[in-house]
Amino acid sequence: MPSQLEALRRHTVVVADTGDFEAMRALRPTDATTNPSLILKAVQQEAYRPLLVQTARAHQGASPAEITDRLLVAFGRQILDIVPGRVSTEVDARLSFDTRATVERARGLIALYQAAGVPRERVLIKIASTWEGIQAARVLQAEGIRCNLTLLFCLPQAAACADAGVQLISPFVGRIYDWHKKNAGAEWVEDARRGANDPGVQSVSRIYRYYKRFGIETEIMGASFRNVDQILALAGCDLLTISPELLTRLAQTEGEVPAALSPQAGHDDADAVRLDGGEVAFRTQLNEDAMASEKLSEGIRLFVADARKLDALIESHGAA
């Protein structure tokens, strides 16, 4: 009998959500995703500290922002030596509400990759799914720079991304689950909210059906998982990005994994209506969704905090 990881691969592209090279070698994902928190975690480990030191010292006098981008690309290059597919590299979250600055920073990241001999087709630029971020992605996609819109918590965000023609979206599962569990308090019944009944799973499934219903080509990559049940309930999603801990658990557990999602599911939603992708509708609908608006803001704040910590590490190694 196959492992659950092997069985999952029959339905879904498996992506590693980590900056840990050794974990990638062991688990053999197709793609990999990184974010400021994962890179910060990696460079605090002895195995990866030399990459920070070498990058910082090689560019003494450059700004922390420039060193950070060079460090992200250094990680990305090594990741692409391990995975056969793509790596996602994130634009500084402090630019989440600045379309022009996001575009410029993304162009710079792609230029660094291309200077290192990495074709742009192997890189996804991660951008927060704010209105400004989505408009930046629209510009970048038109230039052939492929984007991964992250911190996505609701269908209106996904619809706006589709209208912008982005390559891929990363709707979050675990953070939606966290919000609903916290807000339910004593009324939360864990067993009743597992698998297909998990609010995070339901959100991604809704987005998946919407995309398939309207023939939207943007890829959907479920992200932010808290447990294996959430992963298995989304088998069949285009891609799933999973932590090494949960990938290992899947690899160590035998069992078949049936597809929970299929393209046909979207055609069953015959009454679905295509959402208005305009700015007013986007901001109104996001504001009315307490969970999505709160988790988007919180996610940006967390990434900004880790970006500042990374700046401090860079400065401590003489880069500023």
Swiss-Prot record:
In which organism is this protein found? Bordetella pertussis (strain Tohama I / ATCC BAA-589 / NCTC 13251)
Signal peptide start-end? none
Q: What is its main location?
A: cytoplasm
Could you tell me which CDD domains the record lists for this protein?
A: Transaldolase_TalAB
Question: Protein name, please?
Answer: Transaldolase
Spell out the reaction equation it catalyses: D-sedoheptulose 7-phosphate + D-glyceraldehyde 3-phosphate = D-erythrose 4-phosphate + beta-D-fructose 6-phosphate
A Gene Ontology biological process in which this protein takes part is: carbohydrate metabolic process
Question: What are the protein's UniProt keywords?
Answer: Cytoplasm, Pentose shunt, Schiff base, Transferase
Q: What's in the GO CC field?
A: cytoplasm
Gene3D superfamilies membership: Aldolase class I
Under the subunit heading, UniProt states:
Homodimer.
Q: What does this protein do?
A: Transaldolase is important for the balance of metabolites in the pentose-phosphate pathway.
Which family is this protein grouped under?
Belongs to the transaldolase family. Type 1 subfamily.
- The annotated active site, in chain numbering, is K126
Q: Identify the Pfam families for this entry.
A: TAL_FSA
Matching entries from PANTHER family are given as: TRANSALDOLASE
Enzyme class at the top of the EC tree: transferase
Q: Report the locations given in the UniProt record.
A: Cytoplasm
- Specify the pathway: Carbohydrate degradation; pentose phosphate pathway; D-glyceraldehyde 3-phosphate and beta-D-fructose 6-phosphate from D-ribose 5-phosphate and D-xylulose 5-phosphate (non-oxidative stage): step 2/3
Might you give the EC number(s) for this enzyme? Answer: 2.2.1.2
